[in-house]
Amino acid sequence: MAKILVVDDSPTEIHVLQTILEKNGHEVVVADSGEAGIEKAKETMPDLVLMDVVMPGMNGFQATRQLSKQSETANIPVIIVTTKDQETDKVWAKRQGAKDYIVKPVQEKGLIEHVNMVLSS
């Protein structure tokens, strides 16, 4: 299926997302910070990025903006996956270049529906 980069500083969240995605046939690459996510995206050229927001250093909004502004990664869609559930956060994510927004905790069916929707657009 697709190669998906998961960017999250929580090993538990990475494990949950990786398990769901691999169970559904996707190849998963991981990074534990916004900075590492940008570098990993350049190295692996994933089909999609799942990006946490609250991380030390560069947050997920900043990393998403960087990915959307760099020519080599600008066409890689990003889905924000976060505990932040405010409408202002969702609007801000879109302004930074995110294609979709999922609130944690994720459920397998919902995650896969969002992933498939973004990958098919």
Provide a role label for each language-model segment.
Residues 44-50:
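Active-site beta3 strand of CheY-like receiver
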Residues 104:
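A Lys-centered signature of the CheY-like receiver
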Residues 11-29:
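Two-component/phosphorelay signaling modules centered on CheY-like receiver
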Residues 55:
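Receiver (REC) domain active-site loop signature in two-component systems and cognate sites
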Residues 15-18, 62, 85-100, 109-113:
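Alpha4 helix (beta4-alpha4-beta5 surface) of REC/receiver domains from two-component response regulators
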Residues 30-39, 60:
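Helix N-cap/capping motif at the beta->alpha junctions
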Residues 39, 61-74:
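Short amphipathic alpha-helix used as the core "switch/output" element in two-component signaling
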